Amino acid sequence: MKFHFRILTLLTCLLCATVAFSQVKITGKVVDAAGEPIEFATVRLLGTAVGTNTDTKGLYEMTVPKADTVMVEFSCLGYSTVTRQLIKPEGTVTINPKLYEKTLELGEVEITEYKKQTTTMQGIDVDMLRRTPDASGGSVEAVLTTMAGVSSKNEMSSQYMVRGGSYDENSVYINGIEVYRPQLISSGQQEGMSIINPDMVRKVEFSTGGFSAAYGDRMSSVLDITYREPEAFEGALAASLQGGSLMLGHSTRHYSQMHGIRYKRNSSLMGSLESKGEYDPQYFDYQTSLVFKPTDKLRIALLGNVSINDYRFTPVNRETSFGTSEDVKSFTVYFDGYEKDKFQTYFGAGAVTYKFNDKGTDLTLQASGYRTDELVAYDIHGEYWLDQAGQELGVGKYHEHERTRLKMNVLDLTLRGNVGINNNSISYGLSMRKEDIYDRSRQWQWRDSAGYSLPHIPDQVNVIFTEISSNDLNTTRIAGWLMDTWRFTSSAGFWSLNAGVRLSHWNFNGETLISPRVSLGFVPERNGNLSLRLAGGVYYQAPFYKEYRQQVMDTLGNRNILLNKDIKSQRSIQVILGSDYTFRALDRPFKLTAEAYYKNLSNLIPYEIDNLKLVYSGVNSSKGYIAGVDMKLFGQFVEGTDSWLSLSLMKTQEDLNGVKVPRPTDQRYSIALFFTDYFPNIPRLKFSLKGVISDGLPTTAPHLTRADSYVRQPAYKRVDVGLSYELVGKEHRPTSGLFSHFKEIWLGLDVFNLMDISNVSSYYWVTDVNDIQYAVPNYLTRRQLNVRLSASF
């Protein structure tokens, strides 16, 4: 009996060995034309049911039977199919194919297919940024504001709101490093330029919610930017009536560098504002990106930025007419004084990455530092008249004074890594951040109406508002995260599951946060044109400088700013359900995207919005919700060009002092159109249009809350158009001379605010002696022309 058992065991071992030696393992990485990994690419053995899909790193691995000839096919929606033939393969074979974007030829027009989206991160085409009409100066954010769920109320600013969140609830990353914007910005005139240099951008990814645990504690959105690595000497330059930019890049075998300089001076745009005077804004920005690769496994990267924004304004007068055709009011002011603001920011980061293998296992040690030095200083005196049909409603004087100085240093040290195991991609990280804040501020406002100081108290001269701040703060934040992305194929279709958790601790208030997050994507086997996704989690908005500044009234009526150590992070429990459906109409590709979402909000810190300035109460005293639906139709509205139409419906409400009121970001509807076209007889002449119609936001008078009373601003309506003519291009480049060295040269003409609509950014509140307040609208820019020239080489 023992003899028979040994014979059976020996035969089994021989059979297993025969099977093992009769199989071939095929591994590799699928990338696009730029060398970027392609996720969800299909790898299959032709003529069989054997196949697999690439993971988030573009990696794959499968085992196939040994044969004299093995045909392996690589495919992905939006890319051309590649087939590799293996002759008598043995052992382990590595194939790293490169897939190129798939186009369909229709005469002289090329139509591109669209890739599927199985996560909440969506990609944005970088090339369209260069020819988009943008009053803020050609920022990446200008395209974001046409996306579903995203809105902006100020064309001079790159700030945006996402699905009922505030400007402060959006995080921005460049090369995996979180970056910040100045904190004291209160208007688009002060802001200058976005920290993102569009000439240096290679990839843009954006999420309007439901993002993974790898991203920090923000409740609304993530904008993830990746800068390019030049492959040779290259450059880009641009000049317009708003300013100019220059980018230069160079690379060798182991080293690449890229430098960008931008200058902006949009005094002509500000000249269309109703407050007349001498505008002298100057904005300067320098960025550098250096990458050193001594070996195939080691990568050292440096990123640096210097930004200096000076805003100087000497007002002279202002004349504003508002109301209806039957009830016209006029507001006239004569000014005396000045405003001088300065915002200096410095940012530097370094990262060392070691790649252990080609399966997506790597480790990165990253250090970054951010410093901002901000000064807001103005002394403005004015005399005003408010009339209604020739009848004087109010007359008076006012004096506004502010001296605010903010210095902030943020140091961050992060260790993060990835581990690739079969169809799983595990990511983890640990970070420590030190924040050092110096805050000094003194503000006051005095008003006199009909010879009386407001507030009117007999035998006293009083100011209407006084605020004093003198605070120093040094805190530490620690965070860690762990997540896994698992991609697999079943008989039902393709699945993508991302689950993770983020933990953080802040020593200022002793708060520890646990943030679980999960997303699931599914592409059914029976309908490959449809993709579904479900995402949710617990998201927090960790307080940062402005949120925990609390106003406390002293016995003299002064508002003193104290730091609330009992502050807690705002919490948002989110659920998002979305789908994409790709189809062809008129023999052109389209993609219809729809998402529904609900956010349960608690521990809210109430705030009011004044133009771009958010004024927080400094205490957790509210709760609320956000619910909405976003839809976007993306496709070839015109053959060969990409356009899209977005529609967003949303409602957000909070319980403020026991009263249910709309939140400051309650924008019930938003419609945005981004449209591109070309002239058939002049294909080198391109046309682009960016149009927005969105509901007005609720607002209230200074030093009041929406629980007391509020008004809703008029709807924001704006259309910007641009014409671009290709002077030099791929198909018509001179063979000799100066212009033969250029890849492209474009000459453009933009018309900002084509319909010349007066949009409201905020209100100036006038109070008469009877303490009746009148809301005088502060209008944004009117119609303006811009000429631009851009080139790349």
Regions found by a protein language model. Give the residues of each.
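Gram-negative outer-membrane beta-barrel transporters
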Residues: 490-493, 597-600, 617-700
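Periplasmic N-terminal accessory/gating domains of Gram-negative outer-membrane beta-barrel systems
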Residues: 80, 93, 116-170, 176-211, ...
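C-terminal beta-signal and adjacent terminal beta-strands/loops
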Residues: 692-700, 725-793
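Surface-exposed extracellular loop regions of Gram-negative outer-membrane beta-barrel proteins
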Residues: 317, 525-574, 596-616, 690-704, ...
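Short, acidic, small-residue-rich periplasmic hinge/interaction motif at the N-terminus
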Residues: 31-34, 41-46, 71-81, 89-133, ...
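Face-selective signature of the C-terminal outer-membrane beta-barrel domain
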Residues: 293-309, 337-509, 593-596, 644
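Outer membrane beta-barrel strand-and-loop segments of large Gram-negative receptors
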Residues: 402, 406, 410-414, 568, ...
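Membrane-embedded beta-barrel scaffold of Gram-negative outer-membrane proteins
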Residues: 364-368, 378, 566-620, 625, ...
